[in-house]
Amino acid sequence: MVIKINQFQRENTVGSGQVLAQFHQIGAQYSFEPQVISSYGKWGNHWIDKLTAFERKLLNDSQEHPNPYNQLIMDCLPYFIGISENAIQYFQESLYEKRYDFVDQGSITFHRYHDNLKQQVVWLSDLMYDHPVRDIAEYIRVKLLEAPNLDSILLFLQDYESVRPLSVFSWRLLYARLLYPIHFYDFFAKKN
């Protein structure tokens, strides 16, 4: 199953942040949390599971196949474990934040958002149910990894907030998600 995106969303008349915020507003109207594709409120557990499995696999690979590449990965491992644990801890502390708003309810989101709404077709396999900040963080992460342009990131955030302002809780989740090195895990998942 696919979703066809309206033509107006691909034109440059509306900013990317506004389009994503409108998408999240529509997605938040979905009244049921689809358990199979939901990550809402589960980032901490997912991140812990991913870190544990990743650490176990790298240790196993380095023991079974000792080579310079695996040695380099093992040398970097404490760094990635450390920043992963920092992100997990910050996320868990953020759950105690009481300054949240209607924008913090679950919505339809993307697995890894990168201007997906500019495409003519969105595949259902790319969608999930989560906190809208997931898409904002992944958009920012890609922009930072491609060619850091803080002005375009700030414009995106301003566009988004002109439609759907973020709460303090949302900002904390955004920071936690950006802190977690998911791009590192994605890279190694593709390599193996």
Tell what function each PLM region has.
Residues M1-V36:
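ATP-binding pocket architecture of kinase catalytic cores
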Residues I5, D126, L144:
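Conserved protein-kinase N-lobe ATP-binding Lys motif
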Residues I5-Q7, P34-I108, L155:
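ATP-dependent phospho-/nucleotidyl transfer catalytic cores
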Residues I88-I136:
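Active-site acidic catalytic loop and adjacent metal/ATP-binding pocket
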Residues V133-P165, L178-N192:
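Active-site activation/catalytic loop segments of kinase-like enzymes and analogous catalytic loops
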Residues L166-S170:
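Helix N-cap / loop-to-helix initiation motif
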